[in-house]
From Swiss-Prot:
Homodimer. One of its GO terms (cellular component) is cytoplasm. It is found in: Cytoplasm. This is Chaperone protein DnaJ. Its cofactor is Zn(2+). Residues 1-22 are annotated as: Disordered. Binds 2 Zn(2+) ions per monomer. It comes from Rhizobium tropici. Keywords: Chaperone, Cytoplasm, DNA replication, Metal-binding, Repeat, Stress response, Zinc, Zinc-finger. Residues 1-48 form the J domain. SMART domains: DnaJ.
Length: 331
């Protein structure tokens, strides 16, 4: 396995007095143990190696902690590819083309916006294909050349004692090509960083924590590779009056002690901007719940609508006249 090969290559017993090999050996073990975590394996499968760089996809302080060193990504990808059965092919194709990284954008909306839906305009700083070299990374009029060290494979094999170890080509860094005359705008990367404006459709009934995927709106690929995706992570701000449970809404409405005892009506505002009148029967108790059918949240991509549940709270008067006190004492 890739782990065993790398572990044997950098084992301290095989490399006495070699501090660099000892450091690599520790990193190999750390990477292997880290990637046994199902959550982190899922993150790598979704976001690639970018999920473990700079604290993850905008999350801050996440997967990136403790992973340093310029050559660590090669070790990391070797081990992860072996664990997932996919080798090192993720995001990279022939000719040095690499898929662009996926991006994450956090968006907060109000409960009213989640109720009605909206089209939001967002600005996203991202990498786009260089318009000078059309993504090739080479100066116009020139072409990348096949790497002479690895013959275009991006990998080389080296003897290590009794073993033959495959590693990333040191000349082309796994791309399989070299660019003798790089583009002056993108410096051979095939992409540049700009800020783009995008429209995001937020459907009515969207729930807190929903993820919206915009295919191909992530970072541009390297040297003509496909673009990554943009993921919009939505959070719905808590409402000052309503609480949400799926498609149903809940609220508490205070009524006077007189209304509770003798009956009456009150109006309650709803998210559609209207008011609904609720009839209170005589002898209504604290905690009594009324249901307004169809006054809750719309069900996502459906014609169904949830209900609004109103819980009664009874206001106890704090200041009573002598006459009011006498009347209450008669109960």
């Amino acid at each position: 396995s890739a782990f065993r090969k790398l572990a044997m290559q950098f084992h301290p017993d095989k490399n006495p007095d070699d501090s660099n090999a000892e450091r690599k050996f520790k990193e190999i073990n750390e990477a292997y143990e880290t990637l046994k975590d199902p959550q982190k394996r899922a993150a790598y499968d979704r976001y690639g190696h970018a999920a473990f760089e700079h604290g993850g996809m905008g999350g801050g302080g996440g997967f990136g902690a403790g992973f340093g060193g310029g050559g660590f990504s090669d070790i990391f990808e070797d081990i992860f590819g072996e664990m997932m059965g996919g080798g090192r092919a993720r995001g990279r194709s022939s000719g040095g083309r690499e898929r662009g990284a996926d991006l994450r954008y956090n968006m907060e909306i109000s409960l009213e916006e989640a109720f009605s839906g909206k089209t939001a305009q967002i600005r996203v700083p991202t990498s786009i294909t260089c318009d000078v070299c059309s993504g090739s990374g080479a100066k116009p009029g020139t072409q990348p050349k096949t790497c002479g060290t690895c013959q275009g494979s991006g990998r080389v094999r080296a003897a290590q004692g009794f073993f033959s170890v495959e590693r990333t080509c040191p000349t082309c860094h796994g791309r399989g090509q070299i660019i003798p005359d790089p583009c002056t705008k993108c410096h051979g990367q095939g992409r540049v960083t700009e800020e783009r404006s995008l429209s995001v459709n937020i459907p009515a009934g969207i729930e807190d924590g929903t993820r919206i995927r915009l295919q191909g709106e992530g970072e541009a690929g390297l040297r003509g590779g496909p673009s990554g995706d943009l993921y919009i992570f939505l959070s719905v701000k808590p409402h000052e009056f309503f609480q949400r449970d799926g498609a149903d809404l809940y609220c508490a409405v205070p009524i006077s002690m007189t209304t509770a005892a003798l009956g009456g009506t009150f109006d309650v505002a709803t998210l559609d901007g209207t008011k609904s009148r609720v009839s209170v029967p005589e002898g209504t108790q604290v905690g009594k719940q009324f249901r307004l059918k169809g006054k809750g949240m719309p069900v996502l991509r459906s014609s169904q609508v949830g209900d609004l549940y109103i819980q009664i709270q009874i206001e106890t008067p704090q200041k009573l006249t002598k006459r009011q006190r006498e009347l209450l004492q008669e109960f």
